[in-house]
């Protein structure tokens, strides 16, 4: 125990001992996601962006304020974890997107309906195109 002012601080249970917990959470997250193959449906990209932004801010703050090396190491570890989870998210999103494209039927099977939809989309996206398209 260390005495700081009028308070005693137990340094054995400090908050820097959480890197083992981070590793356990990462390992279980990666294993369950690999087994299910549904990471893209469980987590949103916006959530991952906020999570990465928070960890990036944490690393930047630790580095710029000259924190303890263990804090900088933990921040780097968190950033690496975020990169792994984001790459896993993108991999399964592309993989599952290809599966969905194979099994989805075509919406407009005949060419006349496709042409009408294309012309109406051009009318919505480019209003200048409307007067010249029907002459």
From Swiss-Prot:
Superkingdom: Eukaryota
**One Gene Ontology term, aspect cellular component:** lysosomal membrane
Gene Ontology molecular function: L-lysine transmembrane transporter activity
What gene makes this protein? SLC66A1LP
- Protein species of origin: Homo sapiens
Give the InterPro entries listed for this entry. LAAT-1
PANTHER family xrefs = SEVEN TRANSMEMBRANE PROTEIN 1-RELATED, SOLUTE CARRIER FAMILY 66 MEMBER 1 LIKE
Q: What is this protein called?
A: Putative uncharacterized protein SLC66A1LP
